[in-house]
């Protein structure tokens, strides 16, 4: 998965020459990799391209700023509290890094969408792989956080505290390794190519339809369904425990639990549904026509933008909602020399093993 405009198939000059010389019938854009001439000419992309150029550059610029600032703040707070960092905090730190690295690629895709790809094939492969690595890492780290909370609340166990401190780091290394493996197709098949219809260079995949379908299947399973199922199961069990709890603290924590799954599902479900429709059209299971293709292209742009917004929501959901994170943020600002406008002689102090996840305030000593 790379930003949607760059995922469209390249229409090479050699393909155009072959079609003009060998096809008496018209050409089916959905099957441009096949050796046969097909039933319909390539559809005009004016509507979707104009929409992309008006909508995506502004969105990518906004997400770049918000994602960098929000996740940078999370990373700064968690790094400043290394001695008090819990396993959940370590996962949150890796999640913030993944989201920051993802949004750092958005300026490149902004140029690709607004003008053309001017950075060469090497940077095309690196940017696409970096984008995908952090796309998968964000989803899988959310699943790790869910499982960690599940063990802590439902089974009252802290698996990462009983073993060596490196155990949680090893889990994160495994996650990053899997994501790097999933990004291998980007290093192989992404390149800067000239689209003769658009008369512009773009960073796009070059592989047959079966490869495109397989890659989309991997994205759907590893980047969405599997993490969502893990989160749904873990948080369903957590909710069952919290609902029978009479403590006000646990009832407050339940709100955050619900928001976590709902936000992930709302941000990414529309995109994967649209991609599923597009894939079914590619496979011939749904009829393809120019009007439907144009609507699907626009829908992919809108829903992919909604998905990328999840990178900006993570700091809000996992940190800024938490009272303890705000306390840690305030303590960091005080150490950096910011004036204290709260009028308190004493500032809240956190337990050395309290997670930034918590919604409940700590008690001043």
From Swiss-Prot:
Which residue stretches belong to region Disordered?
342-365
Which residue stretches are annotated as topological domain Cytoplasmic? 79-88, 148-169, 245-256, 323-365
Q: How does it sit in the membrane?
A: Multi-pass membrane protein
Q: Which residues are glycosylated?
A: 22, 32
What about PTM? Sulfation on Tyr-27 and Tyr-29 is essential for CXCL10 binding. N-glycosylated.
Swiss-Prot/TrEMBL keywords: Angiogenesis, Cell membrane, Chemotaxis, Disulfide bond, G-protein coupled receptor, Glycoprotein, Membrane, Receptor, Sulfation, Transducer, Transmembrane, Transmembrane helix
Q: Which family does the record claim for this protein?
A: Belongs to the G-protein coupled receptor 1 family.
- Protein name per UniProt: C-X-C chemokine receptor type 3
Gene it is expressed from: CXCR3
């Amino acid at each position: 998965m790379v930003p949607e405009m760059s995922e469209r198939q390249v229409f090479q000059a050699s393909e155009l020459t072959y079609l003009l010389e060998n096809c008496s019938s018209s050409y089916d854009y959905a099957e441009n990799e096949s050796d046969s001439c097909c039933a319909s000419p390539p559809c005009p992309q004016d509507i979707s391209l104009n929409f992309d150029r008006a909508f995506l550059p502004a969105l990518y610029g906004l997400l770049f700023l918000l994602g960098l600032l929000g996740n940078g703040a999370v990373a700064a707070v968690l790094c400043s509290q290394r001695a008090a960092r819990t396993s959940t905090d370590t996962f949150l730190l890796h999640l913030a890094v993944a989201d920051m690295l993802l949004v750092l690629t958005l300026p490149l895709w902004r140029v690709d969408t607004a003008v053309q790809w001017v950075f060469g094939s090497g940077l095309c492969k690196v940017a696409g792989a970096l984008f995908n690595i952090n796309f998968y890492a964000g989803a899988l780290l959310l699943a790790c956080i869910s499982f960690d909370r599940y063990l802590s609340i439902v089974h009252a166990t802290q698996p990462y505290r009983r073993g060596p401190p490196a155990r949680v780091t090893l889990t994160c290394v495994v996650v990053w390794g899997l994501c790097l493996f999933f990004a291998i197709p980007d290093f192989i098949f992404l390149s800067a190519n000239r689209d003769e219809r658009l008369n512009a260079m773009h960073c796009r995949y070059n592989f047959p339809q079966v490869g495109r379908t397989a890659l989309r299947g991997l994205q759907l399973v590893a980047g969405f369904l599997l993490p969502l199922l893990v989160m749904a199961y873990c948080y369903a069990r957590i909710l069952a425990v919290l609902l029978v709890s009479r403590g006000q603290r646990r009832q407050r924590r339940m709100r955050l639990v619900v928001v976590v799954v709902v936000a992930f599902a709302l941000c990414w479900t529309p995109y994967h549904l649209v991609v599923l429709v597009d894939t079914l059209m590619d496979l011939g299971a749904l009829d393809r026509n120019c009007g439907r293709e144009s609507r699907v292209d626009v829908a992919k742009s809108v829903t992919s933008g909604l998905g990328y917004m999840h990178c900006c929501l993570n700091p809000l959901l996992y940190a800024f909602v938490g009272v303890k994170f705000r306390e840690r943020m305030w303590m960091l600002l005080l150490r950096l020399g910011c004036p204290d406008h709260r009028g308190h002689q004493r500032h809240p102090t956190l337990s050395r093993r309290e997670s930034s996840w918590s919604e409940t305030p700590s008690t001043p000593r």
